Design a protein with these regions (language model features):
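Beta/coil-rich, acidic/histidine-enriched accessory regions frequently appended to metallopeptidases
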Residues: 2-3, 40-49, 399-452
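N-terminal secretory signal peptides
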Residues: 1-14, 24-30
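Catalytic cores of extracellular degradative/oxidative enzymes
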Residues: 182-371
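Structural helix-adjacent loops and short alpha-helical linkers that scaffold large soluble proteins
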Residues: 318-327, 369-379, 408-418
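Beta-strand-enriched, solvent-exposed domains that form extended recognition/catalytic surfaces
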Residues: 40-159
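Active-site neighborhood of glycoside hydrolase catalytic domains
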Residues: 356-391, 395-401, 410
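Fold-level signature of zinc-dependent metallopeptidase catalytic domains
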Residues: 133, 137-225
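N-terminal export signals
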Residues: 18-38
Length: 452
């Protein structure tokens, strides 16, 4: 049974992170449309590569709209690699007045080079020389405006598999011939997966269309439990894809992590992130880290950072017809998390944060679904987006109160007994008064008695 991730403080410009313990023609599906052929393989591209990029809302604006804790990616991939110290020449034509930003490099929070470098562009000719090199991306902030970008020299094409466009044979040919770039990418409508060449070659025998369809299914499971059904503008999915990146290193005891803009996976995790069977049957870590990019801030006190994230992990398991991790039998006790947590109810000194283990803490969140329907969490996410209450990272009491009051409002019942008396959540006197003021009836069934 995989351990949950633990939060870590801000120490670099990418911001707060959470960690899990324990070519050019390929980019059309992601928003940038290529209009010229790939360049030669072994040296910076000799022929121009032209792209049309369409503007999207900024990642921070999307985070605020979705009431989430972390920003998602706003990168639009080009399928190109810029060698270190090589002048990159490109021309920009802003069709609708907006000029894109160029980014070069890979995300790698714990590595030597931690993040891509940004280069604001101007209309007309531009030359950029990046000291480190890396995959090339563009961003264009807006709402559907377009810009045309022509890469004239200074790049080489990366091997790229794009779902629905690239055949497996073509991708394998790219891996064999496009050897100048040390990076490889897999693209789908909601996915960018950036791998080192060595990492990609480890599992080159996989069915990459099936792999990307599976990743898209997992992303869809997270969107559905989040109530991102497009019923109102505020309930649209985030603009652009999610970015999964192979990283060079993680701290001892860390398996993978999530932070603003991407999920990071070391090579040791690729057997579960880039193989169909591994991701389908042992991919909890990816489900979990992607969940961090969906967590809403309003009801996520520090003590729940590694708990509410698994609302999304469980949703992925159900979507993939996996048995729930909450039903895993602890070999030491012979009991599931439902059973071991129930045995603690009513004991002296019981506190939610200190008395229950990682999976036991997840049990009450699952019991709310069992009691009040599969649409419980989608409805709660929607209400939080529509009201968008604000809280500072330090206001843990406020966010615990929000969890209890929003849950009671969605259920239509007073859940004081469930949260305070049974599970011993730290709901303060203000929170108990807020619950009382809702004037809701008692639930007909005690949710704490329910199990999968």
């Amino acid at each position: 049974m995989r351990k949950p991730s633990s939060s870590a403080p801000v120490s670099r410009s990418v911001g707060r992170r959470t960690v899990l313990a324990a070519g050019a023609g390929a980019v059309a599906a992601l928003g940038a449309t290529a209009t010229s052929a790939r360049a030669a393989t072994a040296r910076p591209a000799a022929r121009p590569v032209s792209l049309t990029i369409t503007a999207r809302p900024a990642a921070e604006a999307e985070r605020l709209r979705l009431a989430q804790a972390l920003r998602g990616s706003e990168f639009q991939p080009t399928g190109l690699y810029a060698p270190a110290g090589t002048p990159l020449s490109l021309t920009v034509q802003p069709c609708d007045g907006l000029v894109p930003t160029l980014w070069i490099g890979a995300w790698d929070y714990y590595g030597e080079i931690t993040e891509p470098r940004s280069y604001p562009l101007t209309a007309g000719a531009n030359t950029v020389t990046d000291p480190h090199g890396g995959p090339v991306y563009l961003t264009l902030t807006g709402h559907g405006e377009r810009a045309e970008v022509k890469f004239r020299s200074g790049t080489v094409p990366m091997p790229v598999f794009t779902l629905g466009r690239t055949t497996e044979a073509d991708y394998q040919h790219q891996l064999d011939t496009l050897t100048a770039a040390p990076w490889v990418e897999l693209h789908a409508p909601n996915t960018i997966m950036t791998l080192s060449r060595e990492g990609a070659l480890l599992y080159r025998g996989e069915d990459h269309a099936a792999l990307l369809r599976l990743v898209e299914t997992i992303i869809d499971s997270h969107a559905r439990i989040s109530g991102l059904d497009g019923s109102k503008p505020v309930h649209r999915r985030k603009a652009g894809p999610y970015h999964f990146t192979e990283v060079s290193k993680v701290p001892t005891g860390v398996g993978a992590y999530a932070t603003h803009g991407y999920n990071g996976f070391p090579r040791a995790y690729l057997d579960r992130a880039t193989t169909v069977e591994g991701l389908r049957t042992r991919g909890w870590g990816l489900y979990h880290e992607l969940g961090h990019l969906h967590q809403q801030m309003a009801y996520k006190p520090g003590g729940l950072t590694e708990v509410t994230v698994n609302i999304y992990s469980l949703a992925a398991q159900r979507t993939l017809d996996q048995p729930s991790n909450l039903l895993t039998v602890d070999p030491a006790t012979g009991l599931t998390a439902f059973q071991t947590s129930r045995a603690k109810f009513g004991t002296a000194g019981l506190t939610y944060e200190k008395s229950f283990g990682a999976y036991e803490k997840l049990v009450p969140l699952r019991q709310l679904e069992l009691a009040f329907g599969d649409d419980f969490w989608p409805r709660l996410h929607k209400l939080v987006r529509e009201e968008n209450p604000q809280s500072d990272y330090t206001e843990n009491d406020k966010r615990y109160r929000a969890l209890a009051t929003y849950s009671s409002r969605i259920a239509g019942y007073d859940l004081t007994g469930f949260f305070v008396d049974t599970w011993a959540f730290p709901i303060d006197a203000v929170g108990r008064a807020e619950l009382s003021a809702l004037n809701l009836p008692q639930p007909p069934v005690d949710p704490s008695t329910l199990t999968d």
